[in-house]
């Protein structure tokens, strides 16, 4: 049985390893001949764990300030310099209420059991008791590790691909398809990964699109032909049906709010009369009585009331699974043909996505012009012979800004990293915001641009919505996760960039700026378009995405 001390050492070794091969080898060597492989891998990937602990960094600080009888303000200030695990370790070492253990005695199984119990409680008094109990059997480094598991970030600079491919060279690709970690580990030991496929009622990583700024680029990407599909301005939904059971997952593989999808339980059996079990890739959009899509964000309960004659409508664009048959390895044109055979449209409720078979550049230009004239968001271009590759960016998206010569081909989904006090009438409140992106290579957040221009009502809401720490432009208080040049040090930084808001930022063009740290990339005349509530930091524009956008 693996001890927590052994696990901590593994995490430390992974962090200091120089690259993908070395990190994966460390993990592979560690798990060889161990009976608790699944537990080790599961805890190395806390971000994939579906347990919910009902506490963010600020709440953890609050609870441990009570347990340690330390100043919550002092602990929050310390958090501003680094990470939650380091703060808890520092104050655990200094506290006089609970003496840290001299030697580590916990097993990984005991830690996992604690995490399961913690996820089952919501009352603050119960959380305090559990956190006190675990601290009483921890060394300082033990508790740091436990807190980082609660925070779902071990900071080892090794994501799912590094960890899973230590089990088997193709384990990561299989996981993106099946999303079943336990099954992958069990089958890898039997050298039987090929037998794993899609499982109905278990979410699949959705296939994605990268930006495209020219018709010519599209034909280079798909020389054998493509489908041009309307890019709907709604919410991506993966529909699962198994007999009379239904499940609906967002692009983040989280359950969709019931008020958005409950109606589908009535209509899906009518649209798919022959289907016992099925998995669909689709977009749910609010449409008017003429089946014309309404604006993004109108799916909310209160927004929907503004459109009295509207309906929720499911635009179906792919079938991934049908009655026990995994269809992801079948070419798109065959999947689409099959979908036409098995689905009966229900007007304004369940319909096919609008799709055009493109054979030349002028045809694609005409289809794009038509989409933009109808005030649609743009097009998604798909290889006519392409298989469905979960989690891969194999499609292209071409949006309305494409036609504006010299303008950005696509917006960027950036994370709010900090804020500055406004001037004049906006003095004393956060009015200008520092936007940035995540650098997968360094594990740091880099700055891209500053953004302002919100109306007064929005600014009032943002004061409460954004969880910030005041640093008063003090370089010494810049958190470890942020790389920012002196000229852009903000008045406030977010408590946790991975929990911060994601904003769609558009502008005149991408430009070069030595003052910003995202490889010198910035945005000329940036403007806030909308909050991307449907995305987490993982789906935001990362640095490598930004580089690709500028190359385009």
From Swiss-Prot:
Its EC number is 6.5.1.1. It is an enzyme of class 6 (ligase). Keywords: ATP-binding, Cell cycle, Cell division, DNA damage, DNA recombination, DNA repair, DNA replication, Early protein, Host cytoplasm, Ligase, Magnesium, Metal-binding, Nucleotide-binding. Mg(2+) 1 binds at residue 283. The active site is at residue 231. Induction: Expressed in the early phase of the viral replicative cycle. One of its GO terms (biological process) is DNA recombination. It holds the Pfam family DNA_ligase_A_C. ATP binds at residues 229, 236, 283, 382, 397. Its cofactor is Mg(2+). Mg(2+) 2 binds at residue 377. It catalyses: ATP + (deoxyribonucleotide)n-3'-hydroxyl + 5'-phospho-(deoxyribonucleotide)m = (deoxyribonucleotide)n+m + AMP + diphosphate. It is found in: Host cytoplasm. One of its GO terms (cellular component) is host cell cytoplasm. GO terms for molecular function: ATP binding; DNA binding; DNA ligase (ATP) activity; metal ion binding. Interacts with host TOP2A and TOP2B. NCBIfam families: dnl1. DNA ligase that seals nicks in double-stranded DNA during DNA replication, DNA recombination and DNA repair. Recruits cellular topoisomerase II to sites of viral replication and assembly. Belongs to the ATP-dependent DNA ligase family. This is DNA ligase. It comes from Vaccinia virus (strain Ankara). The gene is OPG180.
